[in-house]
Every structure is written in structure tokens, then in C-alpha cells.
Amino acid sequence: MINDIKKDAEARMKKTVEALGINFNKIRTGRAHPSILDGVSVSYYGSDTPLSQVANISVLDARTLSLSPWEKSMVPEIEKAIMKSDLGLNPVTTGELIRVPMPALTEESRKGYIKQAKTEAEQARVSIRNVRRDVLADVKELLKEKEISEDDDRRAQDDIQKITDKYVAEVDAALAVKEKDLMEI
């Protein structure tokens, strides 16, 4: 019973850390990475479609993305969608190929992105702590119903705290890596 609760807590905390990684990938570092364009949607036959579903996105070099639309007619639409996004990118079209150079980050924009990363990390920590709170409430409920002893309750609390500390440390490590990435010139 307690093991199921601990496994559930660990799974939920792991999902939080994975979601943080996805959010960190969306923060621009000045280096080209296909996930930067994840939030960009293109009008495709009247419906908004993610860019990755209408074009092949690849990294040309450290500072340039290359997009190959699957339909020639989509080139202007894709270009327009990238310009409209709030990413500050200006695509360059050469025939059927769209190149997206990554502008160098200014000191001010780096600090803004670091602040955004810290906010994302803090939200992940809060989410992990909320999972801990919910799980500890479940354990207390078992104790109240006399399904576990006080010793089991104490042991479960200690184990859950260790799991929480482990995932908070993972969040801190991910934040440190992202900050280092952002400060590289």
C-alpha cells in the first residue's frame, strides 16, 4: 500500500521534471535547436497546424535552422508564421528551403531568459512539493484508518522526503545547466 503511494509520488515528480525539460528547450539560448519552433503554428488548409507537421526542421549549423516544407505552396505561410511568433526570428527563403538564423543574444535578453528559466524551475519545485503534500495526506489517512502503524507512517514520510529531495535536486541541476547554456557567448 505504502509502496504504491511512493511509486505514484515518484512517477508524478518525474513527469514534473520531464515537463521542466520540455519548457527549458523552448527557451532560446542563441544556439539552433528544432524545439525552439515547437510553439509555432501554420495555417494549413484553414486549420492551425504545428510547424513540425508541415515541414522538416533540421539544424544546418550551430546558429541556423533549416526548414524544408513538404509542399512548395506552404513556404510563404511558414515564413509568415515564424515572423509572427514572438521568438524574434527572421527567416530567409531560398527557393523551397527556409533558413532561420538565430540572432546573438544580448546581455539583457540573456538575463530575461535566465529569469524565465528560474521561474519555470520554481514552478516545478512547487509542483513537486504539492505532490509530496498530497502523498503525505494519503499516508496520514492510512494511519488514521489504522491500516498502518506509526512506525510505518514515519518511515513513509522519510522515504517520501528523500524522493522529494532527489527530484528538487534534479530541478536545480537542470536550472544550473540552462543558466550555463544561456551565459555562453
From Swiss-Prot:
InterPro entries: Ribosome_recyc_fac, Ribosome_recyc_fac_dom, RRF_sf. Signal peptide: none annotated. SUPFAM superfamilies: Ribosome recycling factor, RRF (SSF55194). It is found in: Cytoplasm. GO terms for biological process: cytoplasmic translational termination. CDD domains: RRF. Pfam families: RRF. GO terms for cellular component: cytosol. One of its GO terms (molecular function) is ribosomal large subunit binding. Its main location: cytoplasm. Keywords: Cytoplasm, Protein biosynthesis. It comes from the Bacteria. HAMAP family: RRF. Belongs to the RRF family. Responsible for the release of ribosomes from messenger RNA at the termination of protein biosynthesis. May increase the efficiency of translation by recycling ribosomes from one round of translation to another. NCBIfam families: frr. This is Ribosome-recycling factor.
